[in-house]
Structure formats: C-alpha cells, structure tokens
C-alpha cells in the first residue's frame, strides 16, 4: 500500500488470531495501516503496539457488528474458516456455521457499515477434488458440490461464490458499492505455522512416518506465509479506484509457483530434524482406503473419543494427486511476484522449540504407534484387495 494513502486505511481481519491472519496484520501495521484483528481466540504471539484485537465469534452477527463499531473500516480481509484438516474436517455442522454462515454475516456487516472492499481467503479446493490438474487457471469451472470429498471444500466453494456474487452490491445510504475478490492459496507453510507442520512433526516424532505414497512424479504446490501476505495486500489495492477496480469480482490462484512432489517438499524437514526419510512407497488407492477406514472409525467413536485421524481422504488427494495452477493472472492483474523460500526457517523454528531427534528417545511409544499403524494398514489392505484375492488366500 502507498504509505501516504495507508495512513487513512483501517482494516479488519477475521481469523486475525491465527497464523496467517496475524502475520498479515503485522505486515499492514508496519505500513502504517490501522489494524483490527477479529477472532474467537487470541493470537499465540504478543500483539504489537498499534494493533487492536477484538474477541468474537464470526457465527454471531452481533459480535461482528461490535467489531465494526467506532471504526471507519476501508477493507475487510475475511480469512476465518473451519475444517481445513484432520478431525476438524469431520465436524460438518460447525464447518457450515463458520464457513457459510460466518461469510453471510461478514457480507451483511460490510454492506451495513459501508465497507468498500473485501478480500476473501479461499482455497485450491474449490476447483480441485482429486482430479489431475496441470497448470490450471481461473477459467476452470467450480468442482460440482456433490463431488467434493469433504465438507470444508464444499462450504468454501459456496462461500467464495457468495463473496464474488456480492461484488457491486450497493452499500447502505447509497455510499458506493462493495468490491470483492477471492484468493485461492495452496497449502501454507512458514516458521511458526500452527496447523500442518506441527502435525507432521508429531507424526515423525511418534515414528508414524514410515512410508510415502502415490506416484513419485506427482506434483503439488505450497505457498510461504510471506508470499500469501504480499498477495492479500496487493489484492486489497487492486480493488481501489486508482487501480481501476481490476480485481473486482475476480478469483486468483496464489502459490510459490514451484510445483514439487509433496513428500520431497517435506524431506528437508524430516532430515533436518535428524530423522530418516522413508523408502517404502504404498499405492495411493491403498492409502485412500486406509483414510476412509479411519474416517469411519472416527464417525463411530468420535463422540466418545475425538481422536486425530492419521489421514483423511481429502488429505490423501491433496498430497498424492498432481494439481498445480498458473500464477499469470495474479502476476498480471495484482503485480504478484512470489519470492523464493524453503523449509529451512521452519526446521530452525522447530529446533529452537525443542524438537529434533535424540538417540534412544520415545522408543516404547514409537513401538506402540508402529503396532497400531500396522494393524490399521492390514485392515485397509483386506478392504482394498479384490474379494476374489482374499478368498483365495
């Protein structure tokens, strides 16, 4: 943002207590923008001077309206969502309340409070549902809702459509119109990331990372948190009149622009923490069957014990099936330029927080986890193999 203009900017970030929302807020604050973080949970890090945090539930319109009070908000970054991975993917009711109901509330509040710009954080998953996509672009149609393998992706697709369809909505009192756009990021990584990397490191430390799966030539994408911050700031600018409202009503794919095999991407993390990268490779369909089995077990037992599934079906697709997208539209219309990053920062972060292999540690726990993993894999194999093969054994 232009420093001279940014002095008059006030932005509200839903999901501002999370990893990415907080990083975005800090970056905007450094540019002189007045930042309001809105989230149900407070940030894990110390809130810098000049940033205001308001605790509230996006599912409650009254909470959102309180956050809008006493502030002439010029842009909302709607990042808050629920159900991205793990056991959260299986809580359909809360996923729908947050991702669809929360988005409806934000759109209503923007209209009432005469907010001129809204940037929505979407996902690759509105297009991808397990099919191979190579260098796809924004002209691709939405994946039909009934084909989504999880409710998170389905609700994010519905919410993105609502946001883009709201572009041009008249604001209250005839004070202009609402300009909206949506960014579709790849999987986020960076030092201190709180969702994906800690789960992966936990599996590594428990001895559960015993195999990889799928075609070794499969390619996926990731986006460093700082590249995603850059994209959101550029998108907010591209909704302004001095940029010709070029981003109005538009979706954009955002990534580092470097397709890579999922497991090779994480090799530096595994080896950097002192562990051995697995050499065993399993068929994708077998692992998908295993994921389906764990989801069924969670469905049956989840109310008694809400355990973390080892993998969900969507996670198998996301990590084992080729899908990557062109950045040309984001480059041309937003001026997006992905900077080069790797996992070294994350490795150092985990080491600084006490992670990394120490000889002889956790052996008994790893043995228990190994046994459980082998047991579930045997069941998955029995389900996966054709019945004629099983009967002949």
UniProtKB/Swiss-Prot annotation:
Family classification: Belongs to the 3-beta-HSD family.
Membrane topology field: Multi-pass membrane protein
A Gene Ontology BP annotation from the UniProt entry: steroid biosynthetic process
Name of the protein in its database record: Short-chain dehydrogenase/reductase family 42E member 1
Main location group: membrane
UniProt keywords, alphabetically: Membrane, NAD, Oxidoreductase, Transmembrane, Transmembrane helix
Record-linked InterPro entries: 3Beta_OHSteriod_DH/Estase (IPR002225), Lipid_A_modif_metabolic_enz (IPR050177), NAD(P)-bd_dom_sf (IPR036291)
Keyword Transmembrane tagged: yes
Residues bound to NAD(+): 156
Organism: Macaca fascicularis (Crab-eating macaque)
Entry GO MF terms: oxidoreductase activity, acting on the CH-OH group of donors, NAD or NADP as acceptor
EC number: 1.1.1.-
Active site residues per record: 152 (proton acceptor)
Compartments where found: Membrane
Pfam families for this protein: 3Beta_HSD (PF01073)
Assigned GO CC terms: membrane
Transmembrane region(s): 282-302, 371-391
């Amino acid at each position: 943002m232009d420093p001279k203009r940014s002095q008059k900017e006030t932005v509200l970030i839903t999901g501002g207590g999370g990893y990415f929302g907080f990083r975005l807020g800090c970056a905007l604050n450094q540019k002189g923008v007045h930042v309001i973080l809105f989230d149900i949970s407070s940030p894990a890090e110390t809130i810098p001077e000049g940033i205001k945090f308001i605790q509230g539930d996006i599912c409650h319109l009254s909470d959102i309206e309180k956050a809008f009070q006493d502030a002439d908000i010029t842009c909302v970054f709607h990042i808050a969502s629920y159900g991205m991975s793990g056991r959260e993917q299986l809580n359909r009711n809360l996923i729908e309340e947050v991702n669809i109901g929360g988005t409806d509330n934000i759109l209503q509040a923007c209209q009432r409070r005469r907010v001129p710009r809204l940037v929505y954080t979407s996902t690759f998953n509105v297009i991808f549902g397990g099919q191979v996509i190579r260098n796809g672009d924004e002209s691709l149609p939405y994946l039909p809702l009934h084909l989504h393998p999880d409710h998170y992706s389905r609700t994010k697709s519905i919410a993105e459509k609502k946001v883009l369809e709201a572009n041009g909505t008249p604001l209250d009192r005839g004070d202009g119109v609402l300009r909206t756009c949506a960014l579709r990021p790849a999987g986020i990584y960076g030092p201190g990331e709180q969702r994906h990397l800690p789960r992966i490191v936990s599996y590594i430390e428990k001895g559960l990372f015993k195999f990889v799966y799928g075609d070794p030539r499969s390619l996926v994408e990731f986006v460093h948190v700082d590249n995603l911050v850059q994209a959101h700031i550029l998108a907010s600018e591209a909704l302004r009149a001095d940029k010709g409202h070029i981003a109005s009503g538009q979706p954009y794919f955002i990534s580092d622009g470097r397709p890579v095999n999922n497991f090779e991407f994480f090799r530096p993390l595994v080896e950097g923490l002192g562990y051995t990268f697995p050499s065993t490779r399993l068929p994708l369909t077998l692992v998908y069957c295993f994921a389906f089995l764990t989801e069924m077990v969670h469905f049956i037992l989840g109310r008694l014990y809400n355990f973390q599934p080892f993998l969900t079906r969507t996670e198998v697709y996301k990590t084992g099936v080729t899908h990557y997208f062109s950045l040309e539209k984001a480059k041309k219309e937003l001026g997006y330029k992905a900077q080069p990053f790797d996992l070294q920062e994350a490795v150092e972060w985990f080491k600084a927080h006490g992670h990394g292999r120490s000889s002889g540690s956790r052996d008994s726990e790893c043995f228990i986890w190994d046994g459980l993993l082998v047991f579930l894999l045997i069941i998955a194999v029995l389900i996966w193999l054709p019945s004629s093969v099983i009967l002949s054994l």
